[in-house]
A protein has these predicted regions:
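Interdomain hinge and pocket-entrance segments immediately C-terminal to HTH DNA-binding domains
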Residues: 88-95
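Short alpha-helical elements of helix-turn-helix
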Residues: 1-19, 37, 66
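A short LG(V/I)-centered, amphipathic sequence patch enriched
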Residues: 44-61
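Alpha-helical residues within the helix-turn-helix
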Residues: 27-28, 45, 66
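Residues within the DNA-recognition helix of helix-turn-helix
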Residues: 32-35, 39-42
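Helix-turn-helix DNA-binding elements, focusing on the entry/boundary residues of the two helices
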Residues: 21-22, 40, 54
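Short, solvent-exposed amphipathic helices
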Residues: 64-81, 89
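Short helix-boundary/capping micro-motifs
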Residues: 14-30
Length: 95
């Protein structure tokens, strides 16, 4: 499995896109800032493109970064919906 197949990585990148900050993302998700940057570097390496302009503060998404975050947000929404459907089924089966 490729590293970017991990939805946790998507969650990290989407959060960084919203906050523009690895530190705020780490605080929000309970991760060390260094691990947030490590995730970002791994995803960018596999995609072969930078997702953030690191020269600006707060960091800003590149065009490819905006595309990545848009699609990743949809995937995370679908994952949440899928889990909700199965949680409802479990509740009905137990009830």
């Amino acid at each position: 499995m490729r590293k970017i197949d991990n939805l946790d990585f998507y969650r990290i990148i989407v959060s960084m896109g919203r906050t523009g900050s690895a530190k705020l993302t780490g605080d929000k998700l309970g991760l060390e800032t260094s691990n947030v940057f490590r995730c970002l570097r791994q995803v960018e390496k596999e995609l072969g493109a930078p997702l953030f302009d690191r020269e600006k503060r707060p960091m800003q998404l590149t065009e490819k970064g905006r595309t990545f975050c848009s699609i990743a947000e949809q995937m995370l929404t679908l994952q949440n919906h899928l889990l909700d459907v199965f949680n409802e089924d479990v509740d009905e089966d137990e009830g």
